[in-house]
């Protein structure tokens, strides 16, 4: 758990990312979701996972970053909220986007416990804090938070109960 206390606003945005992950699951996708919020508290991007559509790079975070950077490059003051700790690929996308703050719900460690038997979501045994901690510019990594809520879209999914 992070030592940083989340504000009610941050918790509300994190819950919105978790809702996006549930929407992805409801659409037959893997249950991951994220939103990007600007410095004026506007949700400027929302994206769920699209990997089952055939493109393994279409994780929620890479989709959101890819879509927003087509129209906006000034993301330093934005926060990315994600239902689950980003993988190495998504952490790289966050770094390259210039986003300087990321908050996540479910930890990579707890995700691995859920997914390891399915073979659909092979784990990388490295967390986003280690990856983003090596960045050339500071990126605040906050989480895990409200894991009891963030895990709900995953319950039963990885053991075939979609």
Curated annotation (Swiss-Prot):
The cofactors required by this protein are: Zn(2+)
Q: Name one GO molecular function term.
A: zinc ion binding
Q: Where is the active site?
A: 61 (proton donor)
Its UniProt entry gives the catalysed reaction(s) as:
cytosine + H2O + H(+) = uracil + NH4(+)
**Coiled coil where?**
none
Fetch the InterPro entries from UniProt.
APOBEC/CMP_deaminase_Zn-bd, CMP_dCMP_dom, Cytidine_deaminase-like
Any single Gene Ontology cellular-component annotation: cytosol
Q: Which superkingdom, per the lineage?
A: Eukaryota
Keyword Ion transport assigned = no
Annotated substrate binding lies at 159
Please list the residues that bind Zn(2+): 59, 87, 90
Q: Where in the cell is it found?
A: Cytoplasm; Nucleus
Alphabetically, which GO biological process terms does the record hold? cytosine metabolic process; UMP salvage
Q: List residues of the CMP/dCMP-type deaminase domain.
A: 8-132
- The EC number(s) given in the record are 3.5.4.1
Q: Which family does it belong to?
A: Belongs to the cytidine and deoxycytidylate deaminase family.
Role according to the record:
Catalyzes the hydrolytic deamination of cytosine to uracil or 5-methylcytosine to thymine. Is involved in the pyrimidine salvage pathway, which allows the cell to utilize cytosine for pyrimidine nucleotide synthesis.
Q: How is the quaternary structure described? A: Homodimer.
Q: What is this protein called?
A: Probable cytosine deaminase
